[in-house]
């Protein structure tokens, strides 16, 4: 079966060579194409006359300060250039008396869309796109669980995934690449600001850094919220493909979508990490520039700003960390003399084994009457009663020993019936126990 997902690299290379594709757009040509695209969107029939194109080129020519005398000739050259590069299609016949009709090609739409609409990357747009994807994948997974022949899978599973979900993933991926370009532009703006007035530059840099960081985190939170659910739905479809060798094309599409989704989500976190590093770099640069101001450039600017304060008021932000005092005397020698005297009873040492033996003997004596008289042992009540007699530091050891000794005596009949007991508080510090009443003793 021919691969329906993508062409191979050699096929694409030969296809490009046979059609002699080539792209070359100068700034004025690109502006002309964008003007055509925007004007075309306002047309109901999508058709453009040559006079329309010349009028649009006139606007471009005025912005680029080009000569009016050669306008018609340059407009014709620009139109022919866009037709040659397949950005425009020209239609003419003997009935139109030399008047041609133009339509923008898919290539022209794609290039213009990249520069115009793809810059509108926001959390709202991303949320809507992910919502559409979730609905499409949900319907596809429901259809996959119904089963059916290859035709059914192709129409109800493969088609929506390939022509809706995959295209939206590609759109999100392209938007993310636009965000990369936007970050580079912000870095260039910050570099320009740092060469200007210092106190204004620092404030503007902080604003740019904070806005970009906030946008990246907001977009990443949106992706993370939907990513796991989308992956789960794709796995749900993939599980329906087990044993269906005739549906390999669907399985390959699922794998491609999973890779695209992983790439989209990982991009967000990588972008945040890189931006955090850049944020720190900018702040370090500012601090270093101030600390290593050998020529006193910053000092001169500060003095000049103070002199001109009433003409150009400004705010000064200061921060001072509390000093850490070193109370140690550097000349103090280590005192190795032995301490003499008696320790308080609270500090006297008792080995852990001695303490445990004492507690065990006490608990055995306390629990023995329950077995002798056949009384049930409510561990919660016993623990609560006994722990009240000991300091908090020994509660853990006492509770463990009580439970060990009680379990040796017998078991709870409710345990064999799989009845889960409720949690009971056993001290005032939040400790709780979950245990059924022991009512069956060992013989």
From Swiss-Prot:
Instruction: Extract one GO BP annotation from the record.
Output: chromosome condensation
Compartment annotation: Cytoplasm, Nucleoid
Give the principal location in a single coarse category.
cytoplasm
Keywords carried by this UniProt record: Calcium, Cell cycle, Cell division, Chromosome partition, Cytoplasm, DNA condensation
* Xref: CDD domains: MukF_C, MukF_N
> Does the record carry Calcium as a key word?
yes
Q: Which Gene3D superfamilies match?
A: Chromosome partition protein MukF, middle domain, MukF, C-terminal domain, Winged helix-like DNA-binding domain superfamily/Winged helix DNA-binding domain
Q: Name one Pfam family in it.
A: MukF_C
Positions of region (Leucine-zipper): 209-237
Question: Which GO terms fall under molecular function for this chain's record?
Answer: calcium ion binding
InterPro entries, per this entry?
Answer: Chromosome_partition_MukF, MukF_C, MukF_C_sf, MukF_M, MukF_M_sp, MukF_WHTH, WH-like_DNA-bd_sf, WH_DNA-bd_sf
GO cellular-component term (any): nucleoid
UniProt superkingdom: Bacteria
**Family assignment from sequence similarity:** Belongs to the MukF family.
Task: Describe its function.
Answer: Involved in chromosome condensation, segregation and cell cycle progression. May participate in facilitating chromosome segregation by condensation DNA from both sides of a centrally located replisome during cell division. Not required for mini-F plasmid partitioning. Probably acts via its interaction with MukB and MukE. Overexpression results in anucleate cells. It has a calcium binding activity.
Q: How does it assemble?
A: Interacts, and probably forms a ternary complex, with MukE and MukB via its C-terminal region. The complex formation is stimulated by calcium or magnesium. It is required for an interaction between MukE and MukB.
**NCBIfam families recorded:** PRK05260.1
Q: What is this protein called?
A: Chromosome partition protein MukF
> What is the scientific name of the source organism?
Actinobacillus pleuropneumoniae serotype 7 (strain AP76)
Taxonomy of origin reads: Bacteria, Pseudomonadati, Pseudomonadota, Gammaproteobacteria, Pasteurellales
């Amino acid at each position: 079966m021919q691969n329906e997902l993508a062409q191979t690299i050699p096929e694409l290379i030969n296809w490009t060579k046979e059609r002699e594709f080539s792209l070359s757009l100068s700034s004025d040509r690109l502006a002309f194409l964008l003007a055509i695209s925007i004007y075309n969107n306002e047309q109901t029939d999508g058709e453009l006359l040559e006079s329309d194109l010349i009028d649009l080129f006139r606007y471009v020519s005025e912005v680029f300060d080009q000569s009016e005398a050669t306008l018609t000739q340059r407009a014709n050259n620009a139109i022919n250039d866009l037709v040659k590069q397949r950005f425009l299609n020209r239609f003419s016949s003997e009935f139109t008396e030399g008047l041609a009709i133009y339509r923008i090609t898919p290539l022209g739409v794609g290039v213009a869309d990249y520069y115009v609409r793809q810059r509108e990357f926001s959390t709202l747009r991303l949320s809507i796109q992910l919502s559409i994807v979730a609905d499409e994948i949900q319907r596809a997974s429901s259809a996959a669980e119904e089963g059916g022949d290859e035709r059914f899978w192709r129409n109800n599973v493969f088609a929506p995934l390939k022509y809706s979900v995959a295209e939206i993933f590609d759109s999100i991926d392209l938007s993310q690449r636009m965000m990369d370009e936007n970050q580079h532009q912000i870095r260039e703006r910050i570099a320009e600001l740092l060469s200007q007035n210092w106190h204004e530059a620092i404030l503007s840099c902080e604003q740019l850094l904070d806005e970009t960081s906030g946008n990246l985190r907001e977009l990443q939170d949106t992706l993370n919220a939907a990513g796991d659910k989308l992956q789960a739905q794709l796995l749900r479809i993939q599980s329906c493909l087990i044993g269906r060798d005739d549906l390999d094309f669907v399985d390959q599409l699922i794998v491609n979508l999973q890779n695209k989704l992983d790439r989209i989500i990982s991009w967000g976190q990588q972008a945040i990490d890189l931006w955090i590093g850049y944020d720190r770099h900018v702040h370090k640069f500012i601090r270093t520039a101030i600390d290593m101001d050998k020529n006193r450039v910053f000092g001169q600017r500060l003095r000049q700003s103070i002199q001109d304060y009433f003409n150009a008021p400004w705010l000064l932000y200061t921060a001072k960390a509390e000093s850490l005092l070193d109370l140690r005397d550097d000349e103090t020698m280590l005192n190795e003399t032995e301490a003499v005297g008696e320790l308080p009873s609270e500090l006297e040492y008792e080995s852990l084994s001695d303490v445990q033996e004492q507690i065990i003997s006490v608990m055995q004596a306390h629990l023995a009457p329950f077995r002798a008289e056949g009384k049930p042992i409510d561990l919660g009540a016993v623990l609560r009663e006994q722990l009240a007699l000991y300091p908090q530091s020994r509660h853990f050891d006492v509770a463990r020993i009580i439970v060990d000794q009680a379990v040796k005596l017998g078991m709870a009949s409710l345990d064999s019936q799989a009845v889960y007991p409720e949690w009971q508080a056993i001290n005032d510090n939040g400790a709780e126990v979950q245990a059924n009443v022991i009512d069956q003793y060992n013989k």
